[in-house]
């Protein structure tokens, strides 16, 4: 075996690792090549190649954010509210506190000395009390999306749609009318899309964790409680979390397209993947959209219970004692919700539109 490392001068890239003293397989010793008989050798210059096909500066030319604790998720003052350090954490309603308590949770708790024990949750004081909860948001009213499209999306994907459209606007990337020519020769508007020159060079990455679960919960509850329940034919579209594909379809983006889920690092990793795409020449621009809403009523009852059971969620009711990141007094995570949109692209593309990147 050989250890490969960055840099041609790295001795680790050229030094063989000593084989184990005893064979690691069931084969006879004669069949296990030793250091003299082994035919494996690294190719000359076998090191990590960091030469990119497309050099140059990568910038963020547009961004948007939707945050909790506001009257409107994508209000005009969201950025200023963040800069001002305003508190956007609210108390969870009593019904949700009790619903979590009713789950018969056994919580993992760690003591100051590092020991851990499982503690049954019996008292409301032990439940979840704080969360970042979203305000008003309507994809149709605020962004002009047709109800047909909105109703085929779960809540998180709707938020991602809004964030993506706001980010494009912030990056000064227009959406122009799309037309269909009728048999009589007339042109009929069929929607809005990126300019033709941008469609093939724009990719989409959707970063999210809990897509579609809210829809599944609502449908399961309706099926169990409503005697007149009828199955929603849009169910599959809503639960599979295809916000990236639907967003690309809506804006006419034909570049690479994917969705990732690596928990709290999802958007961060999406930015890294976007840079890789740009450096490799896969596209010239990537719209990164990220969203989650685990604090709405149906989701909070279950996701909050999950965080509480693992000992990761705080059960503190005083926000001044709960919101203590990187502090020895911290006692758990405060669940939240929100959305983000980022336009990552080659610097010259932003410069050509007269955009000063962030």
Predicted regions located by residue number:
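ACP-dependent fatty acid/polyketide chain-elongation machinery
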Residues: 1-149, 347-358
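Stable alpha-helical structural segments in soluble proteins, enriched in small hydrophobic residues
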Residues: 159-171, 270
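Short conserved active-site loop signatures built around small residues
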Residues: 267
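Short mixed-charge
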Residues: 173-197
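Short acidic, glycine/serine/threonine-rich loops at helix termini
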Residues: 70-73, 215-219, 271-272, 296-304, ...
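Active-site-proximal gating segment of KS-fold condensing enzymes and close homologs
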Residues: 151-157, 202-258, 298-318
């Amino acid at each position: 075996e050989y250890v490969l490392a960055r840099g041609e001068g790295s001795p680790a890239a050229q030094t063989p690792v000593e084989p184990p003293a005893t064979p690691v397989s069931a084969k006879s010793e004669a069949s296990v090549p030793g250091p003299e008989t082994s035919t494996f050798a690294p190719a000359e210059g076998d090191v990590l190649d960091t030469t990119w096909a497309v050099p140059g500066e990568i910038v963020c030319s547009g961004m948007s954010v939707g945050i909790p604790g506001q009257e409107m998720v994508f209000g005009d003052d969201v950025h200023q509210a963040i800069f001002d350090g305003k508190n956007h954490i609210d108390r969870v309603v009593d019904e949700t506190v009790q619903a979590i308590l009713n789950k018969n949770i056994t919580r993992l708790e760690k003591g100051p000395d590092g020991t851990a024990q499982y503690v049954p949750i019996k008292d409301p004081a032990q439940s979840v009390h704080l969360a970042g909860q979203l305000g008003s948001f309507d994809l149709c009213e605020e962004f002009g999306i047709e109800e047909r499209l909105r109703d085929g999306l779960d809540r998180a994907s709707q938020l991602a749609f809004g964030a993506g459209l706001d980010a494009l606007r912030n990056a000064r990337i227009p959406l122009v009318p799309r037309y269909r020519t009728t048999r009589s020769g007339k042109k009929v508007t069929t929607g809005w899309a990126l300019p033709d020159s941008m469609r093939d060079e724009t990719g989409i990455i959707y970063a999210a964790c809990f897509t579609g679960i809210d829809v599944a919960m609502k449908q399961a509850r309706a099926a169990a409680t409503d005697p007149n329940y009828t199955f929603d034919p849009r169910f599959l579209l809503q639960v599979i979390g295809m916000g990236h594909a639907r967003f690309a379809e809506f804006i006419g983006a034909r570049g690479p397209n994917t969705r990732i889920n690596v928990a709290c690092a999802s958007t961060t990793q999406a930015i890294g993947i976007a840079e890789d795409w740009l450096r490799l020449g896969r596209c010239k621009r990537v719209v990164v959209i990220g969203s989650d809403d685990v604090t709405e009523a149906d989701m909070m009852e279950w996701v909050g219970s999950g965080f509480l059971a693992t000992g990761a969620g705080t059960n503190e009711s005083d926000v001044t004692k709960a919101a203590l990141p990187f502090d020895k007094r911290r006692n758990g995570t405060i669940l939240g919700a929100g959305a983000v949109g980022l336009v990552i692209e080659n610097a010259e593309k932003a410069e050509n539109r007269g955009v000063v990147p962030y």
